[in-house]
């Protein structure tokens, strides 16, 4: 997913603590460095106002048996098994900026035809069946 902060106008130096929640459980936080408007986003439409944010940073969030990671760096000890999911479980994913964060710089989520990556949020869920007793 492509993310950035949300400043009045744009400001490349506008940090924001973006929290990731799974089923309303905080799984980690990443600090976006800014709200980028210095150059036009590769896929941002020409009709988009030039003084609005143009692009973000592509981030990969992984939750597995070892913890929660963003771009390969561990951001929390929350593990997938902490959720006790089964085949009937609903999964709700949320991004937010808390009012009590150190950096309350808002959040911009880019999708197809905006920013520098022509994609929506991509989600991959993989699982392993538990061993069977024979």
Question: Which sequence ranges carry the predicted segments?
Answer:
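Intrinsically disordered, low-complexity acidic/polar segments
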Residues: 8-10, 29, 102-104
């Amino acid at each position: 997913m492509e993310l950035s902060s949300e400043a009045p106008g744009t400001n490349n130096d506008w940090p924001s603590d973006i929290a990731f929640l799974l089923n309303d459980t905080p799984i980690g936080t990443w600090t976006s460095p800014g709200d980028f408007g210095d150059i036009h986003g590769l896929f941002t439409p020409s009709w988009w106002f030039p003084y609005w944010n143009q692009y973000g940073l592509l981030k990969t969030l992984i939750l597995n048996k070892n913890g929660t990671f963003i771009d390969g760096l561990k951001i929390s000890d929350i593990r997938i098994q902490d959720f006790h999911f089964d085949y009937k479980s609903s999964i709700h994913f949320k991004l937010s900026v808390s009012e009590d964060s150190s950096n309350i710089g808002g959040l911009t989520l880019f999708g197809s035809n905006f920013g520098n990556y022509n994609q929506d949020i991509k989600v991959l869920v993989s699982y392993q069946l538990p061993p069977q007793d024979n």
